[in-house]
Amino acid sequence: MSQKILFIDRDGTLIEEPKSDFQIDTLEKLRFEKDAIPTLLKLKKFGFKFVMVSNQDGLGTPSFPKENFEIAHEKMLDILKSCGIEFQDIFICPHFENENCVCRKPKTAMLEEYIKHELYDKEQSFVIGDRESDMILASNLGVRGLKYGELSWKEIENEILSSFRSASYQRTTKETDIKVKVCLNGGKVSIKTGIDFFDHMLEQIAVHGGIGLEISCKGDLEIDEHHSVEDVALALGACIKKTLGDKIGIARYGFALPMDECLASCAMDFCNRPHLVYKAKFKKSHLGALSTEMIEHFFYSLSYAMGVSLHLKVKGKNDHHKAEGLFKAFAKALKMAVKIESENLASSKGVI
């Protein structure tokens, strides 16, 4: 099973590297880099596993006795363990660069089992290190590299937590072919469903929800818009759900009450018990090429695909504004509900 793994360099990244001899061979030389421990603790709560990958030039030679190395190394591991941080694997290459061994970073021989058995999720794993060789290792593993020194540990934390809140989803049937990409932290907005008014409504979700949203839909519009609207809702809901993963840290609940000349409200709970309460009446049968009855069906399909309990209500005179109000209210509630506000799961059950 693929895991979210951080492949972490040791010297100069996790602990300070002495510029005099580049060896941590005494306890006096052992110092942790600023914010390394609190960052790893936080990332651990979001399901990341840790693997250490380090080059130790000449380890075991007279200039760098193994017993001297192990005194500081074991102390480092003891301190980390006492804080709640453990490495599931530690890989150390003891060779000099001129020995041209098969294991030295950025070569991947030490990580052969991880590659062979696909033990890491390429989209959600990272290499963290302070040297260019670490960045090349990241490329060789097919993951993103984060260079310590150019980034602080807190900036690395932010980069990691923001990057995994995105996902892509494709739904293909005999009636529609839909591709969706969602980035909860913002990004490109491009929506093409073939139904102009529907595109305008979906754009409200992106703009007012502060999310990146790309949707392309090729559907059987020669029949009517039903299949396209329904399947876009199912694909979008599944994609949003995918971005949240195990939902650790999210607020879970959202509520919005935007007002124009109409009053729209939305309450949302990522409870994994899909339900829709919908109260809206329209005078027109269509807004552009979108049937107004399909607005309710869109939110019904969306709520079930997302796994949310959703309450939507709108009152007003202008049908266009009422429809827009519903989508804006949904967007604002979504923005609130998916916000990371803690390091825990918002449930006494331990699962949502």
UniProtKB/Swiss-Prot annotation:
<feature type="active site" description="Proton donor">
    <location>
        <position position="11"/>
    </location>
</feature>
<feature type="region of interest" description="Histidinol-phosphatase">
    <location>
        <begin position="1"/>
        <end position="164"/>
    </location>
</feature>
<keyword id="KW-0479">Metal-binding</keyword>
<keyword id="KW-0028">Amino-acid biosynthesis</keyword>
<feature type="binding site">
    <location>
        <position position="101"/>
    </location>
    <ligand>
        <name>Zn(2+)</name>
    </ligand>
</feature>
<feature type="binding site">
    <location>
        <position position="93"/>
    </location>
    <ligand>
        <name>Zn(2+)</name>
    </ligand>
</feature>
<feature type="region of interest" description="Imidazoleglycerol-phosphate dehydratase">
    <location>
        <begin position="165"/>
        <end position="352"/>
    </location>
</feature>
<dbReference type="GO" id="GO:0005737">
    <property type="term" value="C:cytoplasm"/>
</dbReference>
<dbReference type="InterPro" id="IPR020565">
    <property type="entry name" value="ImidazoleglycerP_deHydtase_CS"/>
</dbReference>
<dbReference type="GO" id="GO:0004401">
    <property type="term" value="F:histidinol-phosphatase activity"/>
</dbReference>
<feature type="active site" description="Nucleophile">
    <location>
        <position position="9"/>
    </location>
</feature>
<dbReference type="InterPro" id="IPR006549">
    <property type="entry name" value="HAD-SF_hydro_IIIA"/>
</dbReference>
<dbReference type="InterPro" id="IPR023214">
    <property type="entry name" value="HAD_sf"/>
</dbReference>
<dbReference type="Pfam" id="PF00475">
    <property type="entry name" value="IGPD"/>
</dbReference>
<dbReference type="InterPro" id="IPR000807">
    <property type="entry name" value="ImidazoleglycerolP_deHydtase"/>
</dbReference>
<dbReference type="InterPro" id="IPR036412">
    <property type="entry name" value="HAD-like_sf"/>
</dbReference>
<dbReference type="InterPro" id="IPR020566">
    <property type="entry name" value="His_synth_bifunc_HisB"/>
</dbReference>
<dbReference type="InterPro" id="IPR006543">
    <property type="entry name" value="Histidinol-phos"/>
</dbReference>
<dbReference type="InterPro" id="IPR020568">
    <property type="entry name" value="Ribosomal_Su5_D2-typ_SF"/>
</dbReference>
<dbReference type="GO" id="GO:0046872">
    <property type="term" value="F:metal ion binding"/>
</dbReference>
<keyword id="KW-0378">Hydrolase</keyword>
<comment type="similarity">
    <text>In the N-terminal section; belongs to the histidinol-phosphatase family.</text>
</comment>
<keyword id="KW-0456">Lyase</keyword>
<dbReference type="Pfam" id="PF08645">
    <property type="entry name" value="PNK3P"/>
</dbReference>
<dbReference type="InterPro" id="IPR038494">
    <property type="entry name" value="IGPD_sf"/>
</dbReference>
<feature type="binding site">
    <location>
        <position position="130"/>
    </location>
    <ligand>
        <name>Mg(2+)</name>
    </ligand>
</feature>
<dbReference type="InterPro" id="IPR005954">
    <property type="entry name" value="HisB_N"/>
</dbReference>
<comment type="pathway">
    <text>Amino-acid biosynthesis; L-histidine biosynthesis; L-histidine from 5-phospho-alpha-D-ribose 1-diphosphate: step 8/9.</text>
</comment>
<dbReference type="GO" id="GO:0004424">
    <property type="term" value="F:imidazoleglycerol-phosphate dehydratase activity"/>
</dbReference>
<dbReference type="GO" id="GO:0000105">
    <property type="term" value="P:L-histidine biosynthetic process"/>
</dbReference>
<keyword id="KW-0511">Multifunctional enzyme</keyword>
<dbReference type="InterPro" id="IPR013954">
    <property type="entry name" value="PNK3P"/>
</dbReference>
<keyword id="KW-0460">Magnesium</keyword>
<keyword id="KW-0963">Cytoplasm</keyword>
<feature type="binding site">
    <location>
        <position position="11"/>
    </location>
    <ligand>
        <name>Mg(2+)</name>
    </ligand>
</feature>
<feature type="binding site">
    <location>
        <position position="103"/>
    </location>
    <ligand>
        <name>Zn(2+)</name>
    </ligand>
</feature>
<keyword id="KW-0368">Histidine biosynthesis</keyword>
<keyword id="KW-0862">Zinc</keyword>
<feature type="binding site">
    <location>
        <position position="95"/>
    </location>
    <ligand>
        <name>Zn(2+)</name>
    </ligand>
</feature>
<comment type="similarity">
    <text>In the C-terminal section; belongs to the imidazoleglycerol-phosphate dehydratase family.</text>
</comment>
<protein>
    <recommendedName>
        <fullName>Histidine biosynthesis bifunctional protein HisB</fullName>
        <ecNumber>3.1.3.15</ecNumber>
        <ecNumber>4.2.1.19</ecNumber>
    </recommendedName>
</protein>
<feature type="binding site">
    <location>
        <position position="9"/>
    </location>
    <ligand>
        <name>Mg(2+)</name>
    </ligand>
</feature>
